[in-house]
Amino acid sequence: MTDPCVYILGTAAVTPLAATVRENCNALLEGRTCFARPRHFDSRGRLLGVDHGLDGTGCSRMERLLRKLADSLDFAVPAGTRLFAATTVGAIDLLEQGNEADTVQEFLHMAERIFDIPDGILVSAACASGQTAAALVMRELRHGRCRHALVIGADITSEFVTAGFGALGALSHTVARPYDQDRDGLTLGEGAAALLLSCDGPGCGRLTAAAENCDAAHITSPDLSGGQLAAVCREVLGGTHPGAVIGHGTGTVYNDQAEIAALQTVFPDGMPPLFSLKGNLGHTLGATGLLQLALGLEFARRRLLPPQAGLVSPMPGANVSNTPRSLETGRLLSLNVGFGGLNSAVALEAS
């Protein structure tokens, strides 16, 4: 028996570049980036994908980001819609201000209040949180546990997270250069995205499959063979060939090495065009997966893939380009990975 279709009824994306999906895609196709020094903490000279419009006092930076996302919705949310909220660290700025609250639970409470949907479901699965939430929603819809679901993902830039990735030696000395031979680390960013999903169509697109696993190779490093990431890719593709891959592409040495190894395993006769948002936006943590799906759907609709920002010398085997490329189909594969060995793949298709 074929699983019911999961239709995408609406999308939203808020980044430092723009506050709509359309405007973000235009900016990405132009190769624009948003890297700057933050004003809300001392980054010790490091650049971040920072939204200065979120600066201020009186409430959490996360609350301002969620309100900006809610204000950007250009679709109606049906009565009875369930809320699924994804984040890596939540309202981490509350902790930095001396508040001992549970930062991810506070994030959920903010989301419930701002979107006016009670009894939300929190998903926090490191940097795979966004797509993990989307996969959970797909299962809930297909089992008839809800009719409509609003899945959101958001994370902010913070001193806490910057210091943590710095301690791991994972931050770039300049800016992230995904899939480049001379990449030297990631750049952190902030943003939010939302998808309204339902088994009731039609919509502007659909999520056709999702799969997740854990390779348990290391707490913070991926399995360099890419074997388990390749496994989830094969599971969601089911023999089909996507027009492009929206990769996790952090710009760290190990992540990109493992990802290219996985894609070469899955596509031995030629890798589809590959692109990572992180060269433009930085690593937005729990928002990353949903930004990839929301913006990826628009790429698929336009049949255009943006140029890879930061690219100078492509890694061997990586099908990346510093110019926009046309897509042969409106089918895309989106990848997320997270600390602890998490691997996630989602396939989507434009209507």
Q: What residue spans do the PLM features occupy?
A:
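Short glycine/serine- and small hydrophobic-enriched flexible loop segments
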Residues: 71, 138-139, 198, 291-301
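Acyl-CoA/ACP chain-elongation machinery
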Residues: 147-167, 172, 183, 210-224, ...
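Cysteine-centered functional microenvironments
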Residues: 5, 12, 118-135, 177-189, ...
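Condensing-enzyme catalytic core mediating Claisen C-C bond formation in acyl metabolism
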Residues: 3-15, 19-48, 175-244
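Glycine-/small-residue-rich "gating" segment that lines the acyl/pantetheine channel
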Residues: 135, 157-203, 319-327, 348-349
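Conserved active-site "lid/cap" helical segment
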Residues: 17-92, 231-241, 266, 270
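Conserved catalytic cysteine-centered active-site region
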Residues: 1-2, 35-64, 90-140, 145, ...
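Extreme N-terminal starter segment of soluble prokaryotic enzymes
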Residues: 2-9, 330-331, 343, 350-351
